[in-house]
Structures are given as structure tokens and as C-alpha cells.
């Protein structure tokens, strides 16, 4: 595979990052309540844009030896083949976070080792070339840490719960970020106090293009989803029905913009649910029971998928009244699923889910067709073991 175009950003990223200082943050609020069980959404995920379908997975070896390398793959629109698209020039041991914009994809590098800030990279040609960007702070350890609006306005959720905003994509690339909200301020606001906000997990944009933030709350049955209206944060009104899993505390694991609204993935104890918002009301799915999540993500039209610790995979279409559908047992080593893209795949690709399985530096792509997984592609990634030790 030709990696020439991407390699041109190596020097640019290195120079852009050299001038940054260590990120600083706001101390999280202290609340005298019992913290709910910690559930962290894994960074392994996939998303769809007009350019294609993207997947993030960790490859290599032990994280303790810094031999874990996060990689970005793309299945470009109107094709059924995957390609390696990881921006070069920055250590990615800390993980990658990505968000699609209007004809672009923004990737953020989480800090690792001595790196205390999060370099960015943006592509407008489906990952063939990347432009470096700056964020003088550490991105949160969650797949929803970046959001890009149709106008190019960009949000970043930091590790300490602060939300920063850049007015345009150019401002984000130039490092012109300003604080939008802090965890302390959101927790002290009326909706934050009402739900007992404890932490932030995702950012997005609502149907009115105003920022949305989501997190974890300690009040049973109430989800911490907030909308920004001219600097005043209000509850988005996501409350689960008054029986069943809603009796537990709610954690928002994922949040994304969809046409006319938003979609969210929620954890309530050992139950996982999807929810959709049209700007006025929420629709909540029936629950799926699971002890843990290996990966999760969203697809076109508010669809969503879950890869559970048991190896079971569940998908939901996103339409009102839709229910979770179990996929056949995924192949061994599967770390992430990828939904059908917004465009039509090449003839014979089936238009169904792909399962991306990792073994060391080898990625194997399996495609679901007629109720069974079939191997369709294999990619060997040039992992540089020992380069980050």
C-alpha cells in the first residue's frame, strides 16, 4: 500500500507538537455521594461519514511494554476494501479518537508516556492526506471525546471533564480553542445537580447545532445529557421508564448526531440501551443484558452496535420501535464491528456488517453474508515493536 501521501504530515505533526506545553485542566468537582460503578466506553469503535466507514482498533502487543499501537482503518465509499489510514508522525499508544465532519474526519491522539497533550490530524480525502492540528490538553479516554458540526465548529472533551470549542476547522487546526464548560460548572448547574453529575463521557451537536454534553449521574433513572443554549446548560430530558433497569444509575457510553437529532448508548447496571432524540422527545429501546462491553459504535440513520465481553454482538436499526438483533457469533479475535456505509458497497459485498479481528500486527476482515461470517481481506500493519519503549 502506498503510504507516501500520509508520510508528508510526519514533519508537520512533529513541528506542530514541539511548541506545545503540557495541558492544564480544571479540578473535577467533589460531590459527597457514592460513585456509581465505573464503566468506561472502550476506544475501539467505528463510524460512518460521506467519505466511507472508519474503524479504530488496537494492534501489536502489551500496553505495559508500550507495544500497543492504535490504528485507523477506512473502507472508502462505494468499495468493499479496507485500507490502513492512521496519521503518521505521532505516538498512538494512548489511543485514537475520531469524529466526522462536513466532508472531513478529525483524529485525536490521546496522551501516552511523556506526552501531556493531544495532537490532531484532519483529512478531507478519505485518509489519503492529513493536516496536523493542535489541542494543548489531554483528550478524555472515551470514543465521544471529539465532535464536529456541519459548520466546522469542533468540540473536545478533556480528561478532566472540561469541554473546549473551536469556532471552525481552521481554528481547531491552529490550536485556537476556548473553554466552553467545566465539569465543576456543569455539576453545579441546575440540571447537573438534579441528576447528580459525576463525570463527562461524550460531546456532540444537537439538531439546532448547539453543543450537547453527556456524562454519568448518580440519581437513578436519569441520564446526564445536557444542551447548551447561549451559554446556559439545560437538561435534554432523557429519563428512563420508571421500572426495570431504570432503577439503577445511568451512564452515557456513546453519543452522536444523526439527521434531525441524536442517538445515545446507555449503561444501567448490567443493561445496555439505545436512545434517540428528535429535539423534542426521546425514544428508548428495550435493554440488552451484558457484564461488559468490548466495543460499541453507531452507523447510518441512528443505527448502533455492541460487541459484548462474551463475544456476542448486537445491532439495532435505529427506527422507532426497532429491537436489538443478535448477530452470529463473531470470529475469534474480533475487536470492532463496522456497519454498512452510507453509500452502496461494490457488487458482491453484501451491504452487511464487517468484523475486524486482530492478531498481533495482522488484521483480518470478516463479512456477514447469508447468516455466516466469511473472510474477505487481510492486512498486515507495519507495527514497529519496541519503538515506544
Per-segment meaning from a language model:
Residues 20-23:
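C-terminal motif of bacterial Sec signal peptides marking the signal peptidase cleavage site
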Residues 39-48, 90-101, 138-150, 188-205, ...:
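Repeated scaffold domains used in trafficking and secretory/extracellular systems
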Amino acid at each position: 500500500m502506498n503510504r507516501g501521501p500520509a508520510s508528508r504530515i510526519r514533519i508537520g505533526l512533529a513541528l506542530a507538537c514541539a511548541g506545545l506545553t503540557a495541558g492544564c485542566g480544571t479540578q473535577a468537582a467533589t460531590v459527597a455521594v457514592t460513585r456509581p460503578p465505573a464503566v468506561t466506553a472502550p476506544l475501539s469503535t467505528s463510524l460512518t461519514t460521506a467519505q466511507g466507514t472508519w474503524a479504530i482498533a488496537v494492534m501489536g502487543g502489551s500496553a505495559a511494554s508500550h507495544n500497543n499501537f492504535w490504528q485507523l482503518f477506512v473502507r472508502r465509499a462505494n468499495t468493499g476494501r479496507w485500507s490502513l489510514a492512521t496519521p503518521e508522525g505521532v505516538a498512538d499508544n494512548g489511543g485514537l479518537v475520531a469524529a466526522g465532519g462536513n466532508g472531513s474526519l478529525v483524529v485525536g491522539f490521546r496522551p501516552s508516556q511523556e506526552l501531556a497533550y493531544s495532537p490532531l490530524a484532519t483529512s478531507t480525502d478519505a485518509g489519503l492526506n492529513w493536516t496536523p492540528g493542535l489541542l494543548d490538553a489531554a483528550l478524555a479516554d472515551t470514543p465521544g471525546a471529539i465532535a464536529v458540526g456541519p459548520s466546522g465548529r469542533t468540540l473536545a472533551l478533556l480528561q478532566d471533564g472540561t469541554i473546549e470549542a473551536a469556532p471552525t476547522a481552521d481554528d481547531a487546526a491552529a490550536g485556537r480553542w476556548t473553554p466552553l464548560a467545566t465539569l465543576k460548572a456543569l455539576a453545579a448547574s441546575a440540571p447537573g445537580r438534579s441528576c447528580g453529575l459525576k463525570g463527562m463521557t461524550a460531546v456532540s451537536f444537537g439538531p439546532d447545532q448547539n453543543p450537547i454534553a453527556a456524562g454519568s449521574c448518580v440519581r437513578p433513572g436519569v441520564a446526564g445529557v445536557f444542551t447548551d443554549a447561549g451559554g446556559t446548560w439545560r437538561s435534554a430530558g432523557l429519563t428512563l421508564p420508571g421500572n426495570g433497569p431504570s432503577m439503577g444509575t445511568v451512564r452515557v457510553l456513546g453519543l452522536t448526531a444523526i439527521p434531525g437529532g441524536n442517538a445515545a448508548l446507555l449503561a444501567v447496571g448490567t443493561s445496555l440501551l439505545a436512545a434517540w432524540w428528535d429535539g423534542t422527545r426521546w425514544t428508548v429501546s428495550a435493554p440488552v443484558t451484558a457484564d461488559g462491553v468490548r466495543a460499541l459504535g453507531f452507523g447510518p440513520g441512528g443505527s448502533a452496535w455492541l460487541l459484548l465481553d462474551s463475544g456476542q454482538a448486537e445491532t439495532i436499526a435505529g427506527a422507532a420501535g426497532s429491537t436489538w438483533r443478535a448477530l452470529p457469533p463473531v470470529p475469534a479475535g474480533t475487536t470492532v464491528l463496522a456497519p454498512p456505509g452510507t453509500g452502496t458497497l461494490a457488487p458482491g459485498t453484501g451491504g452487511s456488517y464487517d468484523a475486524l479481528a486482530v492478531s498481533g500486527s495482522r488484521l483480518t476482515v470478516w463479512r456477514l453474508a447469508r447468516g455466516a461470517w466469511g473472510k474477505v481481506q487481510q492486512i498486515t500493519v507495519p507495527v514497529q515493536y519496541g519503538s515506544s519503549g
